[in-house]
């Protein structure tokens, strides 16, 4: 009788345990599907807008001093949902290899366009190395911050290179969080990743968008001589606004020095920087920043609209019009930049390969035409 009672009591427990195990497995499966699938931003569909709609927009574009209300998003800053096989493939592999991309962490509006291939089919992705947590707290950036982030993943350089080789990308941008907690700021980790990528595909263009390493020139030299093609470091904003926009450890003149020294360590490098507009800067300050970058030997510059990622970040002071961005593109070309990418949705890594390759091909064609000797009649 006792044996029968014991069996009667244990049976429901076994059934309950199996049911709980099955439910846990189903829950884990759902979580995995959600992680790999589209997120909320993927479903926020915005209509395509024509230039005529932009020109007819009469909404307020500048927030006056003392105003707290956020500006309404103008039509030229609305984008369509990211779709396509390339986009889905890259996103799925990012999840599998536990890699981070600044495209997602920084909520870039161009993710579908870059991952999908863009106008000329040049696929570009931007991978964020050294984790998803930064030691700095810039007031414009949505990346997580902490004084001491988790340790580096020693397998990341190989995992990153393996993923990139399987994607068949033409151009890859490696960026990273700041790691002031590490003696070398993570410079050796970044350099190793570049070497692993080039070992698998020597033809791929590699751009590194790197921190300032608090002005440590040994770290700058490590990156400059790692085998990369483009050394990028963003100045972000004009000199006057730098203390309010960037982390207190970032300095305007320090950024210029990093860019100057990178070129000195490796004269064959292309150097690049980026400026956000809409934070309250004046035209004169933008002009001076562009000139400072040229004096530092910077070859390429991008200008884009600052967009407030959350309510905790800096508010947008002004939405700059596409016409104004066009002006700065023309001005950048006049100042002698190899290329200037300027537009409301342009980001430092926006279609980097497409802009870069197109510009290089155009310049080569111009040089070829200029050196051709006319045939005798």
Curated annotation (Swiss-Prot):
<dbReference type="GO" id="GO:0046872">
    <property type="term" value="F:metal ion binding"/>
</dbReference>
<keyword id="KW-0004">4Fe-4S</keyword>
<dbReference type="InterPro" id="IPR006638">
    <property type="entry name" value="Elp3/MiaA/NifB-like_rSAM"/>
</dbReference>
<protein>
    <recommendedName>
        <fullName>Lipoyl synthase, mitochondrial</fullName>
        <ecNumber>2.8.1.8</ecNumber>
    </recommendedName>
</protein>
<feature type="domain" description="Radical SAM core">
    <location>
        <begin position="119"/>
        <end position="338"/>
    </location>
</feature>
<feature type="binding site">
    <location>
        <position position="349"/>
    </location>
    <ligand>
        <name>[4Fe-4S] cluster 1</name>
    </ligand>
</feature>
<comment type="similarity">
    <text>Belongs to the radical SAM superfamily. Lipoyl synthase family.</text>
</comment>
<dbReference type="InterPro" id="IPR031691">
    <property type="entry name" value="LIAS_N"/>
</dbReference>
<feature type="binding site">
    <location>
        <position position="141"/>
    </location>
    <ligand>
        <name>[4Fe-4S] cluster 2</name>
    </ligand>
</feature>
<keyword id="KW-0411">Iron-sulfur</keyword>
<comment type="pathway">
    <text>Protein modification; protein lipoylation via endogenous pathway; protein N(6)-(lipoyl)lysine from octanoyl-[acyl-carrier-protein]: step 2/2.</text>
</comment>
<dbReference type="InterPro" id="IPR007197">
    <property type="entry name" value="rSAM"/>
</dbReference>
<dbReference type="Pfam" id="PF16881">
    <property type="entry name" value="LIAS_N"/>
</dbReference>
<feature type="binding site">
    <location>
        <position position="134"/>
    </location>
    <ligand>
        <name>[4Fe-4S] cluster 2</name>
    </ligand>
</feature>
<keyword id="KW-0496">Mitochondrion</keyword>
<dbReference type="GO" id="GO:0016992">
    <property type="term" value="F:lipoate synthase activity"/>
</dbReference>
<feature type="binding site">
    <location>
        <position position="108"/>
    </location>
    <ligand>
        <name>[4Fe-4S] cluster 1</name>
    </ligand>
</feature>
<dbReference type="GO" id="GO:0051539">
    <property type="term" value="F:4 iron, 4 sulfur cluster binding"/>
</dbReference>
<dbReference type="InterPro" id="IPR003698">
    <property type="entry name" value="Lipoyl_synth"/>
</dbReference>
<feature type="binding site">
    <location>
        <position position="114"/>
    </location>
    <ligand>
        <name>[4Fe-4S] cluster 1</name>
    </ligand>
</feature>
<keyword id="KW-0408">Iron</keyword>
<dbReference type="GO" id="GO:0005739">
    <property type="term" value="C:mitochondrion"/>
</dbReference>
<dbReference type="Pfam" id="PF04055">
    <property type="entry name" value="Radical_SAM"/>
</dbReference>
<keyword id="KW-0949">S-adenosyl-L-methionine</keyword>
<dbReference type="InterPro" id="IPR013785">
    <property type="entry name" value="Aldolase_TIM"/>
</dbReference>
<feature type="binding site">
    <location>
        <position position="138"/>
    </location>
    <ligand>
        <name>[4Fe-4S] cluster 2</name>
    </ligand>
</feature>
<keyword id="KW-0479">Metal-binding</keyword>
<feature type="binding site">
    <location>
        <position position="103"/>
    </location>
    <ligand>
        <name>[4Fe-4S] cluster 1</name>
    </ligand>
</feature>
<keyword id="KW-0808">Transferase</keyword>
């Amino acid at each position: 009788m006792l044996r029968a009672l014991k069996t009667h009591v244990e049976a429901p427990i076994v059934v309950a345990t199996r049911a709980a195990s099955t439910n846990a497995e189903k829950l884990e499966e759902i979580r995995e599907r959600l992680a790999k699938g589209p997120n909320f931003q993927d479903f926020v569909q915005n209509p395509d807008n024509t230039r005529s709609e932009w020109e007819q927009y009469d909404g307020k574009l500048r927030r006056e001093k003392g105003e707290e209300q956020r500006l309404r998003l103008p039509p030229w800053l609305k984008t369509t949902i990211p779709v396509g096989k390339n986009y889905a493939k890259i996103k799925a592999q990012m999840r599998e290899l536990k890699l981070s991309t600044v495209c997602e962490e920084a909520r870039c509006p161009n993710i579908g366009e870059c991952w999908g291939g863009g106008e000329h089919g040049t696929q570009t992705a931007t991978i964020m190395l050294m984790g998803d947590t930064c030691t700095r707290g810039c007031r414009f950036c949505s990346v997580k911050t902490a004084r001491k982030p988790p340790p580096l993943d020693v397998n990341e350089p190989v995992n990153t290179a393996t993923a990139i080789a399987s994607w068949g990308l033409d151009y890859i941008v490696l960026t990273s969080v700041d790691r002031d907690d590490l003696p070398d700021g993570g410079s050796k980790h970044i350099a190793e990743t570049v070497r692993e990528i080039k070992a698998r595909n020597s033809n791929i263009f590699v751009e590194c968008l790197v921190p300032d390493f608090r002005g440590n020139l040994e770290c700058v030299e490590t990156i400059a001589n790692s085998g990369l093609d483009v050394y990028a470091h963003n100045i972000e904003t004009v000199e006057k606004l730098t203390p309010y926009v960037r982390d207190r450890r970032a300095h305007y003149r320090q950024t210029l020095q990093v860019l100057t020294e990178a070129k000195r360590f490796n004269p064959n490098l292309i150097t690049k920087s980026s400026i956000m507009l809409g934070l309250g800067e004046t035209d004169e300050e933008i002009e001076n920043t562009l000139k400072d970058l040229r004096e530092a030997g910077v070859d390429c510059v991008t200008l884009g609209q600052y967009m407030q990622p959350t309510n905790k970040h800096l508010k947008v002071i002004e939405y700059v019009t596409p016409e104004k961005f066009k002006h700065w593109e023309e001005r950048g070309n006049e100042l002698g930049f190899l290329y200037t990418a300027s537009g409301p949705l342009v980001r430092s890594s926006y279609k980097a390969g497409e802009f870069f390759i197109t510009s290089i091909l155009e310049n080569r064609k111009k040089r070829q035409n200029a050196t051709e000797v006319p045939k005798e009649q």
